[in-house]
Swiss-Prot record:
The record marks 135, 161, 376, 485 as: Interaction with auxin-responsive proteins. Induction: Partially repressed by miR393a (microRNA) in response to flg-22 (flagellin-derived peptide 22). Residues 77-78, 343-348, 401-405, 460-461 are annotated as: Interaction with auxin-responsive proteins. GO terms for cellular component: nuclear SCF ubiquitin ligase complex; nucleus; SCF ubiquitin ligase complex. The gene is GRH1. This is GRR1-like protein 1. CDD domains: F-box_AtTIR1-like (cd22159). InterPro entries: COI1_F-box, F-box_dom, Leu-rich_rpt_Cys-con_subtyp, LRR_dom_sf, Transp_inhibit. Pathway: Protein modification; protein ubiquitination. GO terms for molecular function: auxin binding; inositol hexakisphosphate binding; ubiquitin-protein transferase activity. It comes from Arabidopsis thaliana (Mouse-ear cress). Its main location: nucleus. Part of a SCF (SKP1-cullin-F-box) protein ligase complex. Interacts with CUL1, SKP1A/ASK1 and SKP1B/ASK2. Interacts with Aux/IAA proteins (IAA7 and IAA12) in an auxin-dependent manner. 1D-myo-inositol hexakisphosphate binds at residues 70, 109-110, 340, 397-399, 432, 480-481, 505.
Amino acid sequence: MGLRFPPKVLEHILSFIDSNEDRNSVSLVCKSWFETERKTRKRVFVGNCYAVSPAAVTRRFPEMRSLTLKGKPHFADYNLVPDGWGGYAWPWIEAMAAKSSSLEEIRMKRMVVTDECLEKIAASFKDFKVLVLTSCEGFSTDGIAAIAATCRNLRVLELRECIVEDLGGDWLSYFPESSTSLVSLDFSCLDSEVKISDLERLVSRSPNLKSLKLNPAVTLDGLVSLLRCAPQLTELGTGSFAAQLKPEAFSKLSEAFSNCKQLQSLSGLWDVLPEYLPALYSVCPGLTSLNLSYATVRMPDLVELLRRCSKLQKLWVMDLIEDKGLEAVASYCKELRELRVFPSEPDLDATNIPLTEQGLVFVSKGCRKLESVLYFCVQFTNAALFTIARKRPNLKCFRLCVIEPFAPDYKTNEPLDKGFKAIAEGCRDLRRLSVSGLLSDKAFKYIGKHAKKVRMLSIAFAGDSDLMLHHLLSGCESLKKLEIRDCPFGDTALLEHAAKLETMRSLWMSSCFVSFGACKLLSQKMPRLNVEVIDEHPPESRPESSPVERIYIYRTVAGPRMDTPEFVWTIHKNPENGVSHLAIK
């Protein structure tokens, strides 16, 4: 390059670049930029814990202060990844402790985190401040107690939808009396009761506490006491609202909420009785986020609540809201940017539909800033998809989950091909897309042609043949993660577009028609890919033509992993070796 920046000037310039992707691009400019970038990067994101070794990360980024780490594939959220598959945090924690003692923040998602990991964190990082565990497992409240007792500058402790061995609520007592630094505390996934007196003392001596998310065991009386201690909260996850309504309790609850002048986000509300909802009305005008995904409240009561939420930007709710409830959202919540509607029952059927596609049509017409949708329903139509695409071209995330597999447009009995063509063609900024319902290969031809910015794509029960995969891998230029289940494609498209897989983060396939022989050929052809065959009930022998139950393919610079359980077969690069599986000891 003709222009060279002095190192200090370049360091100063890089200090304004926060995006991981932008910093990655900077590091590719030249050797000196690579060196400056790696020595100054404070925040590191690893999207797949097996894509790179912990040692390589610590070696490259010696000044790392924050690590974000992801483990199991996304389909683990739907119980499609067997227990014991992997995603172990210990090698990473051990490597960080040995080389990065100045680490201050760890965020992990879908990882196996043991108490030993948490104890190592507490003992190794003298100025540790942030621990966020999302959908993690393997640890108990003893591990959390170690973090609470030792990390004297802890600002954030969040356990989000984790599976935790709950050994009792006394872990809160391990926070030292000198602990005053907490900004966010989330223990909503725990089961046991906590000592409200311990929690009150902790909250009272934490003047900067802004976010508090409680578990269902916290009663209304406990909630009232805590709100009195922390009226400065901006984010609150309540405990259970199942207690019988008493006038005195209602009055205290209303008063406590009315004093929370800065509250912007509200969640929890487990088993809330409709009679208690008016106690929340005082905070509704200031809410920007409302999560009612655990609140079994019916449509009329929801409407009374939502009509007061004029600033709402994010709404999570169950399908009990019905079409009329979403029509109210469209009328009253003009700032809405994100909508998620979850099923209230796992086995919905078309004979008792609490909401239809019309609810989402209402919102797409009335909420002009809407850019993210997750919508579970029993049936859908092409006409609804046309309207959504026309009214909301600014959508960045569209995840439609039609619960009944292979469900066509229920009014015309046609595939939903043209509707998803409209979404792909009309929503040019789409980054994430989930499709379902009856779809032919044509739908994926349209998606491949128009969805040029889609980075994550999820598909279930769709397509006719290999052409589906061909259209996606040849057309979706920005695709990084592809998840497919129960679709009728096989080897041809997978092998034909093997080079595309090296530009992606991962490909997950389950219950498709991919053969064992194709997996071996792919691994031999693409040495930088790990090809894992996952089968909990493997046959006694595997002929080349035998289909595999699940495969997980991902790009890596670390080589085959060494912690595979017996039901995971790693395809080696040496065709004579074929496959191997190593049991975890």
